[in-house]
Amino acid sequence: MVASNQSEVNIGMVGHVDHGKTSLTRKLTGVWTDTHSEELKRGISIRLGYADCEIKKCESCNEPECYTVDKKCDCCSGKVETLRKISFVDAPGHETLMATMLSGASLMDGAILVIAASEECPQPQTKEHLMALDALGVKNILIVQNKIDLVTEEQAVENYEQIQKFTKGTVAEKAPIIPVSAHHGANLDVLLKAIQEFIPTPKRDETVSPRLYVARSFDVNKPGSEIKDLKGGVIGGSIIQGILKVGDEIEIRPGSKVVEGNKTKWVPIITKIISLGAGSKKLKTALPGGLIGVGTELDPNLTKSDALSGSLAGIPGTLPETLEKITIRPQLLERVVGSQDELLIEPLKTNEVLMLNVGTSTTVGVTVSAKAEKVEIKLKLPVCADSGDRVAISRKIGSRWRLIGYGIIL
């Protein structure tokens, strides 16, 4: 079964701030993903941005010139055939927004690490983003050496060698390095060919109970709308397994926070799928892969301003329990990356405050007990997760949260 309107793979666009991730996404998709007023004002990505593109190929022309995202071949203006539709997840590169990048990494089947040829490599967040991909198990990586139009050939070669040295011994050691100018659209055909070769569509199991990682949630109603015209809340994210259909009843966990006296509990939300969409296309059935919007019967107050981002959605009764405490087996990095002085990472201690990313969820927790092989953490915001899931671990160093490793939930 093929949903031709839907992307089949999610590719993260990651790297240091201002290295050209959003510009490259726009060149490939035609969509400028910095759409929030604060982002436009500051010129940086603050939230995760999403955009789709279709990789097409002309049968008449030679490789790599035959690859394009346009309706006609760039070389001969001839007919093109669509090979695959992909979704890009544009992650913020600013160090203060690392939590957003980590929550986006759980949606990524592969990643493009964008490195500007016009700056020394590696820059702090170039390092931190590569470590994050490694920590969260993203293995299919391409490197784009961007802004080659701003440097001489000698500088480009020197930067290329710096990239090779930086990636040696990392998950990106064998990643192709593709020189590109996003501004001029140079070498995009080579990049598209590499995406086809090095970031395959993962095998998905469509027969099991569906699970949707929720990365965004919205109220799509305009202020002053008539009551009869109001639409239910919308959640956006990616199905990691199974299939969702219009009309399905779904459960969203952890759900709503309910305070009774001195006690707080989390109650799962049950709702019905009213509509499914991928980009501007409507779907009746949504498959794993790509980013989708799910229209629901929920009160829009529950979904506005990303209130449900970090949740897990699925068929009622099939989701993991909501956890207010987790036990993990930690795997710490040797040194702190992303800061100028790369300090040695000390073992986790009891009563330490940590930031954790589980799926698309970001939460803070306090270690209740800390041993080398087993750490128990009480969470401020609960998560819905299974044993075996990966958790990114960050520690506050100075005034910033820094990635220090990952853990596996026991």
Curated annotation (Swiss-Prot):
UniProt region (G3), positions on chain: 90-93
Phosphoprotein found in the keyword field: no
Annotated function: eIF-2 functions in the early steps of protein synthesis by forming a ternary complex with GTP and initiator tRNA.
Swiss-Prot/TrEMBL cofactor(s): Mg(2+)
Ligand binding (GTP): D18, H19, G20, K21, T22, S23, N146, K147, I148, D149, S181, A182, H183
Enzyme Commission number(s): 3.6.5.3
Source organism of the structure: Methanococcus vannielii (strain ATCC 35089 / DSM 1224 / JCM 13029 / OCM 148 / SB)
Region G5, annotated ranges: 181-183
Residues the entry annotates as binding Mg(2+) 1: T22, S45
InterPro entries: EFTu-like_2, eIF2G, eIF2g_C, eIF2g_dom_2, eIF2g_GTP-bd, P-loop_NTPase, Small_GTP-bd, T_Tr_GTP-bd_dom
Region G2, residue ranges: 43-47
Family to which the UniProt record says this protein belongs: Belongs to the TRAFAC class translation factor GTPase superfamily. Classic translation factor GTPase family. EIF2G subfamily.
GO BP terms, alphabetized: formation of translation preinitiation complex
Keyword Metal-binding: yes
Catalytic activity, as annotated: GTP + H2O = GDP + phosphate + H(+)
GO (cellular component) term, any one: cytosol
Residue stretches making up the tr-type G domain: 6-203
Binding sites annotated in the UniProt record for Zn(2+): C58, C61, C73, C76
GO function terms (MF aspect): GTP binding; GTPase activity; metal ion binding; translation elongation factor activity; translation initiation factor activity; tRNA binding
Subunit structure: Heterotrimer composed of an alpha, a beta and a gamma chain.
Region described as G1: spans on this chain: 15-22
Protein name, UniProt field: Translation initiation factor 2 subunit gamma
Stretches for region G4: 146-149
Keyword terms of this UniProt record: GTP-binding, Hydrolase, Initiation factor, Magnesium, Metal-binding, Nucleotide-binding, Protein biosynthesis, Zinc
Binding site for Mg(2+) 2: D18, G43
